[in-house]
Amino acid sequence: PKLRSKVGMVFQHFELFPHLDLTRNLTLAQEIVLGRDSATARAKAGALLERVGLSAHAHKHPGQLSGGQQQRVAIARALSMDPMAMLFDEPTSALDPEMVNEVLDVMVELAEEGMTMMVVTHEMGFARRVANRVVFMEDGAIIEDSPTDRFFRDAASPQAQRFLSKILPHLSLIHI
């Protein structure tokens, strides 16, 4: 299989099929792209919805869910394709603040299980907790690329230092 079929992608606006229920959102690509039979795809969808805490909503359509729930469905859909790695494009930026943690909790679990993830995020507490490298960008350019502990302890670039000086006082108030 091509590399792109082994990489899961989760966008900031979920990109779920609004006319399909959650189960079908998770089974469609499994059946078409991976060639899984319907029963196997449905079983995997059910297990993944359970994993992200949404099995009771399997029959619902995306519009009937909160933003945080929709994003967890998007993560489950990406996982349904058995990816080797996951890409996340600002997965919490479109969410109400109270929904952010339910998505980050799922992502922390993935990291703890060893899933390779590349995450574009402004959630520095999350990055500090799960990342092994931080790539700091400004205006589309890579400014700094360093191990997480070094980035947060002793950022090399003035831009990263300025950014961190604004957010680090707030991170100390958050349990990481």
What are these model-derived regions, one by one?
Residues 1-148:
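ABC family nucleotide-binding domain
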Residues 92, 174-176:
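Conserved small/polar residues in nucleotide/adenosyl-binding loops
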